[in-house]
């Protein structure tokens, strides 16, 4: 098998078998909107058969690391569209990795009013970097209530729809 030979992966035909793994890069703006530097970054890697994006928050509550992107509002979708267009112009394919960080978060890295929620109210060990205060201890999350689960599922459904509207070729969960 030649790593440079095409590969059919579901509905996608990749030009080669090289797949770029997702990497958290912290290059979005303070509103979780992808920036121009991200357009260049992904364009430069479009010769891979498939790019899996960095983790993209499906909602404001899904954010937790500083300067990570979302895909839950029109500005974010438009910015991702610029990125996917650049990748496609170079012959590449790209899927969105949807990521809710759960308990690994800092309120300093989240929009005002969003919460740190997780499957249980168990604090993760360790620290997380914030632009405002450097390394900070991970916070106590609030346990997600059973009746809240449908709303989280809807956030993922909406984020999937937004990813396709933003030009992604697929979604990774």
Annotate each language-model stretch with its function:
Residues 9-10, 17-36, 45, 50:
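N-terminal binding-site loop/beta-alpha segment at the start of enzyme catalytic domains
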Residues 5, 18-21, 51-53, 94-96, ...:
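Hydrophobic faces of well-ordered beta-strands that scaffold small-molecule active sites
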Residues 33-45, 151-161:
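Short, acidic/polar
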Residues 20, 45, 87, 96, ...:
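Conserved, mostly hydrophobic/aromatic
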Residues 1-16, 119-122, 126-128:
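N-terminal carbohydrate-binding accessory modules
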Residues 38-59, 166-170:
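Catalytic domains of carbohydrate-active enzymes, especially glycoside hydrolases
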Residues 17, 55-112, 146-147:
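Acidic/aromatic-lined carbohydrate-recognition and catalytic surfaces
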Residues 99-161:
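Non-globular sequence segments
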């Amino acid at each position: 098998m030649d790593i440079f030979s095409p590969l059919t992966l579901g509905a996608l035909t990749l030009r080669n078998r090289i797949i770029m793994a997702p990497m958290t890069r912290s290059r979005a703006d303070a509103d979780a909107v992808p920036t121009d530097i991200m357009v260049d970054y992904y364009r430069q890697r479009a010769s891979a058969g498939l790019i899996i994006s960095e983790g993209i928050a499906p909602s404001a509550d899904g954010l937790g690391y500083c300067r990570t992107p979302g895909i839950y509002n029109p500005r974010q979708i438009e910015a991702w569209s610029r990125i996917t267009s650049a990748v496609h112009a170079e012959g590449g394919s790209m899927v969105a990795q949807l990521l809710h960080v759960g308990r690994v978060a800092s309120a300093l890295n989240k929009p005002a009013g969003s919460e740190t929620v997780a499957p249980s109210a168990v604090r993760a060990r360790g620290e997380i970097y914030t632009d405002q205060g450097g390394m900070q201890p991970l916070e106590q999350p609030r346990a997600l209530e059973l009746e809240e689960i449908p709303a989280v599922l809807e956030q993922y459904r909406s984020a999937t729809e937004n990813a396709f509207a933003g030009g992604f070729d697929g979604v990774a969960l």
